[in-house]
């Protein structure tokens, strides 16, 4: 089932026309140098940035959804967002709870997400008192809450712009696990990323961008090749297999 379809999607001078489709249950990574257009593409897919061409989500044009209906289908984490000062974490999370879910189910899901992201003891804390990494995890918990399958059966898509920023190793592993759980429930996630080895291990498919163009797209093993990556990033890469797993390294490593 094709969950998301793009036909000649473009944004003025920032994003060249791009067409593709995304099946349910997949994790797609956007990679490319800074300024490649990854954030522009994600904001367009979220319906927050006007674009040319056509975007369809769950078989319906994105432009035809009302704000509340779109919020029920997809959640979007932007790259940067300032913390609201006079609000505790639990109140901030409540802003993202989907309509129609029971309070008990919402409380259970908040507890589950906060435990996984190690936020349980932060629930009463003011947002202004959080570190950068804590605030990032709160933002992640919020967008997961918005579309978590247990409390939002209509959810389809999670759009994350550099979600691993500010996370330590254990927190990155926790996020990986939540994303796999989300996608295994028939949803899809599209994520902008910078760690090429992480993309190599976690992504089902990859969109490789540079200068506002999607230069390569397809399965991870098709796109994550040394010659393709070297040309785009202007770094000499090679791929080595260690313990039956491929790793991307630079040639002068």
Curated annotation (Swiss-Prot):
Organism equals: Yersinia enterocolitica serotype O:8 / biotype 1B (strain NCTC 13174 / 8081)
Q: How does it sit in the membrane?
A: Peripheral membrane protein
The subcellular localization recorded is: Cell inner membrane
Q: Which reaction does it catalyse?
A: an R-cob(III)alamin(out) + ATP + H2O = an R-cob(III)alamin(in) + ADP + phosphate + H(+)
- InterPro entries per record: AAA+_ATPase (IPR003593), ABC_transporter-like_ATP-bd (IPR003439), ABC_transporter-like_CS (IPR017871), ABC_transptr_BtuD (IPR023693), Metal_Ion_Import_ABC (IPR050153), P-loop_NTPase (IPR027417)
List the record's Gene Ontology CC terms alphabetically.
plasma membrane
Q: What is the lineage of its organism?
A: Bacteria, Pseudomonadati, Pseudomonadota, Gammaproteobacteria, Enterobacterales
**HAMAP family, A to Z:** BtuD
The ABC transporter domain, residue ranges: 4-236
Gene3D superfamilies xrefs: P-loop containing nucleotide triphosphate hydrolases
Q: What class of enzyme is it?
A: translocase
Q: Which NCBIfam families match?
A: PRK03695.1
Q: Which SMART domains is this protein grouped with?
A: AAA (SM00382)
Question: EC no.?
Answer: 7.6.2.8
Please list the GO terms describing molecular function: ABC-type vitamin B12 transporter activity; ATP binding; ATP hydrolysis activity
Please give the subunit comment from the record.
Answer: The complex is composed of two ATP-binding proteins (BtuD), two transmembrane proteins (BtuC) and a solute-binding protein (BtuF).
Keywords (A to Z) from UniProt:
ATP-binding, Cell inner membrane, Cell membrane, Membrane, Nucleotide-binding, Translocase, Transport
Quote the PANTHER family the UniProt record gives.
METAL TRANSPORT SYSTEM ATP-BINDING PROTEIN TM_0124-RELATED, VITAMIN B12 IMPORT ATP-BINDING PROTEIN BTUD
UniProt protein name: Vitamin B12 import ATP-binding protein BtuD
Q: Where does this protein hold ATP?
A: 32-39
Q: Which family does it belong to?
A: Belongs to the ABC transporter superfamily. Vitamin B12 importer (TC 3.A.1.13.1) family.
Function field: Part of the ABC transporter complex BtuCDF involved in vitamin B12 import. Responsible for energy coupling to the transport system.
User: Which PROSITE patterns does the UniProt entry name for this protein?
Assistant: ABC_TRANSPORTER_1 (PS00211), ABC_TRANSPORTER_2 (PS50893)
């Amino acid at each position: 089932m094709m969950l998301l379809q793009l036909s000649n999607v473009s944004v003025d001078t920032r994003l060249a026309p791009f067409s593709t489709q995304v099946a349910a249950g997949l994790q797609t990574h956007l990679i490319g140098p800074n300024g490649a257009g990854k954030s522009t593409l994600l904001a367009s897919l979220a319906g927050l940035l006007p674009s040319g061409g056509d975007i369809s989500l769950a078989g319906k044009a994105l432009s035809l959804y009302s704000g509340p209906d779109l919020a029920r289908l997809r959640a979007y984490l932007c790259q940067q967002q300032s913390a609201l000062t006079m609000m505790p974490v639990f109140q901030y999370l409540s802003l993202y709870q989907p309509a129609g879910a029971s309070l008990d189910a919402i409380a259970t899901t908040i507890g589950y997400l906060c435990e996984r992201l190690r936020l349980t003891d932060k629930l009463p804390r003011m947002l202004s008192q959080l570190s950068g990494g804590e605030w990032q995890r709160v933002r992640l918990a919020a967008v997961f809450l918005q579309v978590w399958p247990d409390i939002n059966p209509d959810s389809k898509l999670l759009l994350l712009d550099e979600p691993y920023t500010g996370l330590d190793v254990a927190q990155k592993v926790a996020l990986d696990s939540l994303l796999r759980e989300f996608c295994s429930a028939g949803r899809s996630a599209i994520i902008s990323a910078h760690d090429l080895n992480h993309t190599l291990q976690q992504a089902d498919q990859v969109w490789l961008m540079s200068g506002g163009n999607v230069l390569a797209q397809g399965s991870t093993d098709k796109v994550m090749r040394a010659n393709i990556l070297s040309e785009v990033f202007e770094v000499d890469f090679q791929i080595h297999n260690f313990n039956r797993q491929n790793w991307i390294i630079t040639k002068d490593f």
